[in-house]
């Protein structure tokens, strides 16, 4: 895989979504679940990675993050459903074992 950055969606313990971007998906997920990640996720642990999309640049990932964050929850759910062909979750599960 030749992705330099990722836009990702976490499902929090309370069922809410957190959307972010990173250049190191494994490290970022570990930071979130250690309680040292974003303030939003710290109060809603544990979090589960449900979507990750790769991009050629950090700027592209940041743009995708900003677009998805602006959507209301039903639109986010529609995006997640319609873009499963772009979801790298199975790649990460195979690479890391259980998420």
Swiss-Prot record:
A UniProt-annotated Pfam family: GIY-YIG
Sequence ranges assigned to domain GIY-YIG in this UniProt record: 3-78
Disulfide bond positions: none
UniProt family annotation: Belongs to the UPF0213 family.
Protein name as catalogued: UPF0213 protein SP_1535
Source organism of this protein record: Streptococcus pneumoniae serotype 4 (strain ATCC BAA-334 / TIGR4)
Source lineage: Bacteria, Bacillati, Bacillota, Bacilli, Lactobacillales
């Amino acid at each position: 895989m030749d992705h330099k950055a990722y836009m990702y969606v976490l499902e929090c313990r309370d069922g809410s979504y957190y959307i972010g971007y990173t250049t190191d998906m494994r490290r970022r997920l570990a930071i979130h679940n250690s309680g040292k990640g974003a303030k939003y996720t710290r109060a809603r642990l544990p979090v589960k990675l449900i979507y990750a999309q790769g991009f050629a640049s950090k700027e592209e990932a940041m743009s995708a993050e900003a677009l998805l964050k602006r959507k209301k929850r039903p639109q986010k759910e529609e995006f997640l459903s319609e873009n499963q062909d772009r979801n790298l979750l199975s790649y990460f599960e195979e690479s890391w074992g259980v998420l």
